């Protein structure tokens, strides 16, 4: 399958891919953060920063980013077996029902969008139960010739922005405090991307029991703004 080769265009495609206006519903998920606030674990910006940095370095860097790299390589080489293997591997790494459903819903929404944006390879994933955000994100990155290193940082930055947006509503944080938190997260995002891209297969894997517990308890939380 052909890819675009204009570097400037690839950069703008990436901006579109991580834009908060992308119609995939990511804003409706907090990945357990809502329960963590409700339980009193996160009361201020410093606590939120610790929560986010822990996930960056102990979950996203050893799980999502190396899997993203392998999915990207699989799409580039048209290796359908590898695409499905790493998609299933990622799904197995999602520790709760809510986290699995979040990944599937957002992934299927991105599949529908990419199909409508003239990436026909996305079409079979619209109803695929193992469709996930990383799988379809990797497809777009491969076909739009976005450099993997830049795409990995952007992947983490989009996650971070979504989490900070949720924290602003839930803690609550002021808008300036939210922007200060994003400023603080810029360096850890780059470090986590580099860490994840350097991992060998046998080094992949990680998780945070606190996040898994928060996500599990969120399923029965009485009053909720977010779907996870």
Swiss-Prot record:
Give a Gene Ontology cellular component term annotated to this protein. Answer: cytoplasm
Q: What keywords would UniProt list here?
A: Chaperone, Cytoplasm, Nickel insertion
Compartment(s) of residence: Cytoplasm
User: Coiled-coil annotation: which residues?
Assistant: none
Which Pfam family is one of those matched by this entry?
UreF
Question: Does Transcription regulation appear among the keywords?
Answer: no
Quote one Gene Ontology molecular function term.
nickel cation binding
Q: Could you tell me which InterPro entries the record lists for this protein?
A: UreF, UreF_sf
Q: What does this protein do?
A: Required for maturation of urease via the functional incorporation of the urease nickel metallocenter.
Similarity remark: Belongs to the UreF family.
According to the record's subunit comment, the protein's assembly and interactions are: UreD, UreF and UreG form a complex that acts as a GTP-hydrolysis-dependent molecular chaperone, activating the urease apoprotein by helping to assemble the nickel containing metallocenter of UreC. The UreE protein probably delivers the nickel.
Q: What is this protein called?
A: Urease accessory protein UreF
**What is the organism field in this record?**
Alkalilimnicola ehrlichii (strain ATCC BAA-1101 / DSM 17681 / MLHE-1)
């Amino acid at each position: 399958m052909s890819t675009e080769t204009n570097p400037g265009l690839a950069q703008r495609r990436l901006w579109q891919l991580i834009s908060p206006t992308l119609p995939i519903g990511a804003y409706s998920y907090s990945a357990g953060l809502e329960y963590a606030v409700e339980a009193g674990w996160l009361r201020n910006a410093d606590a939120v920063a610790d929560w986010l940095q822990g996930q960056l370095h102990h979950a996203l860097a050893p799980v999502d980013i190396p899997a993203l790299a392998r999915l990207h390589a699989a799409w580039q080489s048209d290796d359908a077996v590898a695409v499905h293997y790493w998609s299933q591997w990622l799904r197995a790494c999602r520790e709760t029902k809510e986290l699995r459903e979040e990944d599937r819903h957002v992934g299927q929404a991105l599949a529908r969008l990419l199909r409508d944006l003239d990436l026909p390879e996305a079409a079979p994933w619209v109803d695929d139960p193992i469709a996930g955000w990383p799988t379809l994100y990797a497809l777009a990155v491969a076909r739009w010739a976005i450099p993997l290193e830049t795409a990995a940082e952007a992947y983490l930055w989009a996650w971070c922005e979504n989490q900070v947006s949720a924290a602003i509503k839930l803690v609550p944080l002021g808008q300036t405090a939210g922007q200060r938190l994003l400023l603080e997260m810029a360096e850890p995002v780059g470090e986590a991307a580099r860490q994840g891209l350097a991992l060998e297969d046998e080094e992949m894997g990680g998780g945070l029991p606190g996040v898994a517990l928060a996500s599990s308890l969120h399923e029965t939380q009485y009053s909720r703004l977010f779907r996870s």
